[in-house]
């Protein structure tokens, strides 16, 4: 893993980079998007509304660095979703590609069934979360952190005040995760 300085460019430049990355595939997935600010506002008024679950679909090594406070892994979500009742599932990854795939897959699987979940993709994912000033925590300790795993250097456009951590060889790591996904998960 490598660590990138959080102040390589100005915050507005990094926000522009993040938006360009997120917009590059926004129309790729047949899912609704929600912004980081909308999630934050909804969490602030959660009482009496439909429950919302944040699902981090990134790999275990990425999640070990930090997650959005209150998020669960895809594995945890899948093993507990039948006990949640009607809820909204907001999926995220680094920039929104993997979470878009996951949200679309889950929405298709739920269609026509008894699953009363609605699936959303967090626009810009954890990168957008940093630009909105959202809290991240280390899952092992629950302590707040400004370190965020961005998978690869090209996605390290976290907001000022956050530190990007990424794989040295993201394509090799991504291919390994993809292969494990093919053979390691039940459909």
Annotate each predicted stretch with a short phrase.
Residues 34-49:
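Glycine-rich, flexible N-terminal cofactor/catalytic loop recognition
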Residues 49-50, 69:
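Sequence-level motif detector for i,i+2 pairs with an aromatic at +2
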Residues 53, 88-90:
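Structural motif
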Residues 94-100:
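Gly/Ser/Thr-rich loops at beta-strand to alpha-helix junctions
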């Amino acid at each position: 893993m490598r660590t990138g300085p959080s102040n390589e460019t100005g915050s507005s430049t990094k926000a522009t980079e993040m938006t360009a990355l997120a917009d590059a595939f926004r129309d790729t997935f047949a899912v609704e998007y929600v912004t980081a600010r909308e999630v934050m506002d909804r969490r602030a008024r959660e009482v009496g509304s439909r429950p919302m679950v944040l699902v981090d679909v990134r790999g275990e090594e990425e999640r070990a660095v930090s997650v959005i406070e209150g998020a669960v892994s895809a594995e945890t979500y899948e093993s507990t979703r039948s006990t949640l009742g009607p809820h909204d599932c907001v999926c995220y990854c680094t920039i929104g590609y993997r979470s878009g795939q996951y949200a679309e897959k889950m929405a298709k699987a739920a269609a026509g069934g008894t699953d009363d979940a609605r699936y959303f993709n967090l626009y810009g994912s954890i990168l957008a979360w940093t630009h909105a000033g959202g809290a991240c925590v280390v899952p092992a300790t629950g302590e707040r952190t400004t370190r965020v795993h961005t998978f690869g250097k090209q996605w390290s456009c976290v907001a000022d005040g956050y530190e990007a951590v990424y794989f040295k060889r993201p394509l090799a790591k991504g291919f390994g995760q993809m292969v494990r996904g093919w053979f390691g998960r039940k459909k």
